[in-house]
């Protein structure tokens, strides 16, 4: 996600972080999780497939003082999703989730069914007050997004960002 897109996104989200839990399913550098923590999220779950990038995220978490709040998993988001959902649902005090689904754009086409199922699962599992944030390439059809939610979609070329509240 480009810097200006991220700034616009966090401006749109406003105070959704207060005591919420951030989940970044395609973490990359971890910036969305770290930004969420810096804005009041109590914890962040970051999933990154690339082992070097996951290691870098761990180092950054430590440098920023988020090493106890950031739960970093190296692996496939599609395979780890259920485990993360179970962990989040076991919390004695349920908090809203802020779920970021911002994969490499090609995954929206190459893994269409898996992406749709991933979104459906998080939408069905997230507690009331949660939000789902998706970044898609501007030409990606919005039909991939679960149609049982109302999506606020904005264009930030070359991306479009869709947010739904649960």
Stretches found by the model and what they are:
Residues 1-166:
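Class I S-adenosyl-L-methionine-dependent methyltransferase catalytic core
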């Amino acid at each position: 996600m480009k810097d200006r897109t991220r700034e616009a996104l966090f401006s749109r989200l406003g105070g959704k972080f207060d005591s919420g839990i951030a989940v970044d399913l395609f973490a990359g550098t971890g910036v969305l999780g770290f930004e969420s923590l810096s804005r009041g999220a109590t914890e962040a779950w970051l999933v990154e497939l690339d082992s070097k990038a996951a290691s870098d995220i761990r180092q950054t978490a430590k440098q920023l003082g988020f090493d106890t709040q950031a739960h970093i998993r190296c692996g496939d988001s599609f395979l780890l999703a259920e485990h993360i959902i179970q962990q989040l649902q076991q919390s004695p005090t349920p908090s809203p989730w802020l779920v970021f689904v911002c994969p490499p754009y090609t995954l929206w086409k190459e893994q269409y069914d898996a992406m749709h199922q991933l979104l459906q699962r998080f939408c069905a599992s997230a507690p009331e007050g949660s939000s789902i944030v998706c970044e898609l390439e501007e030409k990606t059809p919005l039909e991939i997004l679960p149609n049982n939610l109302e999506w606020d979609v904005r264009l930030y070329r070359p991306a479009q960002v869709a947010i739904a509240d649960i």
